[in-house]
Amino acid sequence: MNHMVRYFGRCLCTIALSEISRDLGVDPVTLAELRTPGCFFDIPWGVDMAGKEYYLTDVFAEGPYAGNRLATIIDASDLSSAEMQRIALAFNFAETTFICGGNSEEGFNVRIFTPAAEIPFAGHPTLGTAYLLRQVLKYSDAQVVKLNLAAGKIPVTFGRDHVLWMQQHQPVFGEQLEHEFVGEQLGVDIKDLNTRYPCQYVSTGLRFLMIPLVSLEALKRVSVDVNDLAPSVFLFAEGGYDDDQQMSARMFAAEFGIIEDPATGSANGCLAAYLAEHRYFGSSEIDVRVGQGYEVQRPSQLYLRASKDREGKFDINVGGRVNLVARGQWLL
């Protein structure tokens, strides 16, 4: 069967001529003779096109058209940093990952790019890439897949009910800021800030300013003026968008080219540490579900488990489900 290749940016997908001619009401022979630059190219079926295989996944998704979208380029070790950055900008998702070799024993080497910069760690790229390596590409059949990121080695465990868990690094608790100052600088109404808990910088590999709010309604109406005070801001409140969620959150990171992130595993790891550190639920051990992304029509659910022992050591785990969305060829 004759095929044509439709060209969108630098992404290829094949479309049967018979299907196109039927939809457009054009004779297939006439359609095959079209040569519209930048739109249709008549390429024989089976021709080897140089490029990179890529996959799209939705991470922290409980269903279709949900979660945080991730693009992953396979076999990317021969790409330069500049090429990776251009590809990440072209996809324009919150993050794009590049698998650059490795193995199941020592771990797989992965680089993470936002549309604006490379970052050492991020949550949903970690889970999405581990899912592809084990479930789709079959590079590993182990229950735990290890990723070698710029921030260090991150193990991802494939748990029950199709939930993937990543263990995050020990948290670093930074400066606490006055609530009035935070409200003035970020344009948040002081009445919406929960003054029982601090506004504090926290990092488990990527730093966020954690801002507690008084209610889900306050979280829904908040409008943040992100600036140099906190280029990555994470706001949270008790109460969920769904009945099975105990908390809700929103994340803004203009520094990395992200206006609002649908689901942020790294920030939720910081939240898990914060909740345990400040005994938010009256305990140094937490097990909660967090809703995020509802304000940007990408409903997401993250599973948080964390504890702090008597020596001050934390065990922080963030989980979620992953859905495979699409695959294709990226022409370089």
Question: Locations of the language-model features?
Answer:
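Serine/proline-rich low-complexity intrinsically disordered segments, especially terminal tails, linkers
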Residues: 13, 20-23
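Short Gly/Ser/Thr- and charged-rich N-terminal loops/segments
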Residues: 35
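Generic alpha-helix initiation/capping and coil-helix boundary signal
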Residues: 7-9, 25, 29, 81, ...
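Short, often N-terminal, low-complexity regions
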Residues: 6, 15-18, 31
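Intrinsic-disorder-associated, low-complexity terminal segments enriched in Asp/Asn/His/Tyr and depleted
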Residues: 2-3, 7, 23, 27, ...
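Active-site proximal loop and beta-alpha junction motif in alpha/beta enzyme cores
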Residues: 45-121, 127-332
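Cysteine-centered motifs
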Residues: 11-13, 39
